[in-house]
Swiss-Prot record:
SMART domains with a match to the protein in the record: VRR_NUC
MF terms (GO), sorted A to Z: metal ion binding; nuclease activity; nucleic acid binding
Cofactor(s) recorded in Swiss-Prot or TrEMBL: Mg(2+)
Domain called VRR-NUC: residue spans: 5-84
Entry protein name: Putative nuclease p44
Record InterPro entries: tRNA_endonuc-like_dom_sf (IPR011856), VRR_NUC (IPR014883)
Entry-linked Gene3D superfamilies: 3.40.1350.10
Function: Nuclease.
Length: 93
């Protein structure tokens, strides 16, 4: 059985988002631990924050804190631990 690594999930996300005309920015915030890995801008004007994880891995407490802050502001945060992008790409329609 081949293990899927977090970086391969992230690369797949970037590639598939690009195919539909979107952009998956690498999101880094110096001095702020736990921000999601990617800020995904989709063609319909929708913005989604995506936390990439290896299969079965869970967000850290710092990441959960940041997810809650973004959610409280009305943003969508998705934890992605597979190459199944159905929770992200339908947002284009």
């Amino acid at each position: 059985m081949r293990l899927i690594r977090e970086d391969s999930i992230e690369k797949h996300l970037v590639s598939e988002v690009r195919k539909i005309g979107g952009i998956a920015y690498k999101f880094v915030s110096p001095g702020r631990r736990g921000v999601p890995d990617r800020l995904v801008a989709l063609p319909n004007g929708k913005i989604i924050f995506v936390e990439c994880k290896a299969p079965g891995e869970k967000p850290t407490p710092y990441q959960l804190r940041e997810h809650a802050r973004l959610f409280a502001l009305g943003h969508q945060v998705i934890v992605l631990d597979s190459q199944d992008l159905s929770s992200i790409l339908p947002a284009v329609n």
